[in-house]
C-alpha cells in the first residue's frame, strides 16, 4: 500500500506541475519564460558542440559542407545548348553521350526524390538519428550527448507525451461535445475556443517555438490560406495563431479519429483523393464556403503531400480555380533542433510523433504574406505558380515545377514524350535546311 500511495502522490505532483506551469499558461496563450530559458541553453549547447566538432574533425566538416550543396556539379543548360558541342548539323551517334550524362545525373542525385527524405545537416545536432556523417570527437562531447539522451528520453518525452495526450483528448472530447449543439454563433465561438486551446497545448508538447511575421496579413474570414506542406504539425503551427476550416486527405488511425471528431464542430472538408466524385464535391463545398464572409478562412496545402522543407513543389490548380482571395503563408522549420518532416511512406503518425517528441524542439518561422487575387487573363495554373513563387522566395525555399505526387507514383510517360518531341524538333529543324540546300 505504501508503494501505491507513493506512486499516486508522485503522479498527482507531476500532473499538478504540468497543469500549473505548462497546461494553463499554454491554454491562454501565455508563457512563463521556461521555454525561452530552455532554448537559450539549447542554442549555447549546440553552438559549443559545433565548435568542438569543427575543431576535432576539420577535414570531415569541410567535406560535409561541400556535400551539402550537391554531390555532383549539374549541367543546367537546355538540350539545344548541351548538344551543340557534341554534334554537327544532323543526328549523330555521339548524341547518346549527352542523354547518358543526363541519365547518370538523375540517378546519382535527382532534384525530386531527395525532397522526400529528411534534410541533411551541416553540423551534428547531438541526436543519434542524425549521427551519420559525424564520428567520435572527444570525451566531453560524448558526455554531453549521453546527458542529452537522458534529458530527452527520461524527462522531456514523459512530459511531452502527457501534454500531447491531454491536448488530443481535450480536442476529441471538446469537438464531439460542441458538435452536438445546434448551429449558432455560440457553437462557432466554442468550436474556435476548443481548437485554439488544444492546438496551443499540442504545440507545447513539441517544445514548439514559433516566430510569426507580418501579422497584419493574417488570413481573414471568407478567404483561402495556402501554405507549403512539411508535416501534419503545420496545422498546429498555424492554428495556434488563428482558427481555420481545413481541407485535406482522409486518414486512418489516430489521424482519422481526430479528423472525425473535428468535423463535428467545424465545417472541415475531408476527401479521398482517388475518388473523382469527392473532388467535385470538394470544389462545390469550397465555393459555398468562401461565398460566406462570416466563415473561417480555409486552410489548404496545394502541394498535396509533405515535402522536406527545402523546396516548394507544384501547386495543384484546383485551389486556385474557385475564386476568392488567396492568403499565402510560408513556413520554414529550423532542422538544427529537430526534423519536422513527415516521411509518411516510412513512419506512421504515432512513430512520427515519437520521433519529434524525442527531438530537442520544433522551431519555425511563419510569414504571413499580402493577399493575392487572380489577375485578368491569368489562368489557374499561372496563378498557382505565382503564389508558389512568392512563398518560395519568402521562405528561402527552392522552387520546383515537379508534382509532389511523384512521391508515390511513377513518372508519367508524357514527361518522357516531351523530351523526345524536343529532340525530334531539333533534328527536323537542323535537317530541313540541309535538305533545302541539296
From Swiss-Prot:
Where is it chiefly localized? Answer: endoplasmic reticulum
Q: SMART domains recorded for this chain?
A: PlsC (SM00563)
Give TM regions. Answer: 14-34, 137-157, 161-181
Question: Does the keyword section mention rRNA-binding?
Answer: no
- Annotated catalysed reactions: sn-glycerol 3-phosphate + an acyl-CoA = a 1-acyl-sn-glycero-3-phosphate + CoA; a 1-acyl-sn-glycero-3-phosphate + an acyl-CoA = a 1,2-diacyl-sn-glycero-3-phosphate + CoA; dodecanoyl-CoA + sn-glycerol 3-phosphate = 1-dodecanoyl-sn-glycerol 3-phosphate + CoA; sn-glycerol 3-phosphate + hexadecanoyl-CoA = 1-hexadecanoyl-sn-glycero-3-phosphate + CoA
EC number(s): the record gives 2.3.1.15, 2.3.1.51
Question: What membrane topology term does the record carry?
Answer: Multi-pass membrane protein
The protein's superkingdom reads Eukaryota
Annotated InterPro entries: LPCAT1-like, Plipid/glycerol_acylTrfase
Q: Tell where it localizes.
A: Endoplasmic reticulum membrane
What this chain does, per the entry, is described as:
Converts glycerol-3-phosphate to 1-acyl-sn-glycerol-3-phosphate (lysophosphatidic acid or LPA) by incorporating an acyl moiety at the sn-1 position of the glycerol backbone. Also converts LPA into 1,2-diacyl-sn-glycerol-3-phosphate (phosphatidic acid or PA) by incorporating an acyl moiety at the sn-2 position of the glycerol backbone. Protects cells against lipotoxicity.
Q: What the record says about its domains?
A: The HXXXXD motif is essential for acyltransferase activity and may constitute the binding site for the phosphate moiety of the glycerol-3-phosphate.
User: Could you say which protein family the record assigns here?
Assistant: Belongs to the 1-acyl-sn-glycerol-3-phosphate acyltransferase family.
Protein name in UniProt: Glycerol-3-phosphate acyltransferase 3
Q: What taxonomic classification does the UniProt entry list for its organism?
A: Eukaryota, Metazoa, Chordata, Craniata, Vertebrata
